[in-house]
A protein has these predicted regions:
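A generic structural motif
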Residues: 30, 165, 227-228
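Short acidic-glycine loop/turn motifs at beta-strand connectors
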Residues: 7-10, 17-22, 152-156, 215-219, ...
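Catalytic-pocket segment enriched in acidic/His residues
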Residues: 9, 170-297
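Glycine-centered flexibility motif
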Residues: 7, 12-15, 42, 130, ...
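Generic N-terminal segment detector
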Residues: 1-86, 95, 103, 237, ...
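Active-site microenvironments in enzyme catalytic cores
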Residues: 47-216
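Short, acidic/polar N-cap/turn motifs at the starts of alpha helices
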Residues: 1-3, 12-13, 147, 209-211, ...
Length: 297
């Protein structure tokens, strides 16, 4: 069972997509309100929605044809780093200028008890399906990072799963680790969507194929895939560290790291179409653009 948000006649609605492909408009204004209603009814969110189906209005169009928004208006998006061997290798390549001739702090954090966690985005900087993701004007090595996102409540409990794009500047991050915020956070540097798969309806979050495809002028230039089965850490472990002595907000999203990285010689260009697909969740599609192009959009 997947939850989505969409815009129709200047109004925002919440919808649900069932396994048989049928979709319905929900009466709750947003995901976290829906979760709260289910808890008051003493039911899981999925069971609560199931009990409402006979009262709901059907959506006859395919959700992908609607004006989809971020499935949850996340007040904050956090991210975990170096949680996959592939990510570790990519960070080491950047930190050693491609020489791979020394152990780095990325090796240490990969094996450390404490994971790398950092602030990635805010609601205003996060975009949804079909929107443009931003490119920095001062970077020459930019890539998308396809990641499984955890949708959390204020206690750190996992409400559901979404697809996320952690846009990154490999040259800025590799130049100096203290530049990480600049390598990760700027206008439209994060996208999530198109759905939130309710946690209770996903059998095994460690058995999801993640794919990233990039098209330039209609030609596929990147096609990479990996699996959450390669994740070094447990999802609850990452959420647990995030909530430790921290205030979480309902609808916070935690991106859990990337298991795939485009080839080292690749960098995004304006107009590139990015498709991030996670099995059982959906395909998040965005187009890359520079800031001055975003202002014209």
């Amino acid at each position: 069972m997947r939850i989505f948000r969409y815009l129709e006649d200047s109004r925002t609605y919440l919808g649900v997509l069932l396994e048989d492909g049928t979709a319905y408009r929900l009466n709750a204004p947003d995901l976290m309100t829906l979760v709260g209603e289910a808890r008051k009814a003493g039911a899981s969110t999925a069971d609560y929605v199931q009990s409402l189906l006979s009262e709901l209005v059907s959506i006859h169009a395919a959700p992908e044809s609607l004006a989809l928004l971020t499935p949850v208006d996340a007040p904050e998006v956090w991210a975990a780093g170096v949680t996959y061997q592939k990510s570790r290798e990519a960070r080491n390549y950047e930190a050693t200028a491609g020489k791979l001739d020394a152990s780095t702090f990325y090796d240490k954090v990969y094996d450390a008890e404490r994971p790398e966690l950092f602030m990635k985005s805010t609601s205003a900087r996060t975009v949804g399906p079909g929107e443009q993701v931003g490119l920095r004007s001062d970077s020459t090595w930019q890539v998308p990072e396809a990641e499984l996102g955890l949708v959390l409540d204020r206690t750190g409990a996992i409400i559901g799963y979404t697809a996320g794009n952690d846009m990154s500047c490999r040259d800025i991050e590799g130049e100096n680790p203290l530049y990480l915020p600049q390598a990760k956070i700027w206008r439209n540097s994060c996208s999530i969507g198109p759905y939130v798969r309710l946690a209770e309806t996903l059998a095994d979050p460690y058995d999801l194929t993640i794919s990233c495809r990039i098209y330039r002028d209609g030609v596929k230039v990147v096609d990479e895939s990996g699996s959450t089965g390669q994740l070094k850490r447990r999802l609850e472990e990452l959420a647990g560290f995030l909530k430790r002595d921290n205030e979480l907000f309902d609808g916070t999203v935690l991106l859990t790291g990337t298991c795939l990285v485009p080839p080292n010689q690749f960098t995004l260009a304006s107009g590139d179409r990015i498709e991030i697909e996670i099995a059982s969740i959906g395909t998040l599609v965005n187009t890359a653009a520079y800031a001055h192009e975003l202002e014209q959009a």
